[in-house]
Amino acid sequence: MAVKDFKPSILEAQAAEVAGVLRAIANERRLMILCKLVEWREASVSSLADAVGLSQSALSQHLAKMRSEGLVAYRRESQTLWYRIADARIERLFATLHRLFCVTNNKRR
């Protein structure tokens, strides 16, 4: 979207939802959890805990916050919980974040 096409009045109706999403991802650990879920598509709690360096208990607290905002969903397979991104907009948001912050030729302007 070009800056000239930016219309804050359109965002106003969605401001509460957007603020909730931004609050939910405004944590380094949750950012990395979501990055792993975007990369892997689905992951067990134990594999996520290992990947992001958290105890399963701490990870579960982060996942609960993200579940309450509708960012992640899970399915149970026997005793294992498998998490995934619940909203395709989150995948697109992370693709944009990756493009803006992780691609080596992008520098702060």
Task: Locate each region found by the language model.
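Regular, well-ordered alpha-helical segments
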Residues: 24, 68, 99-102
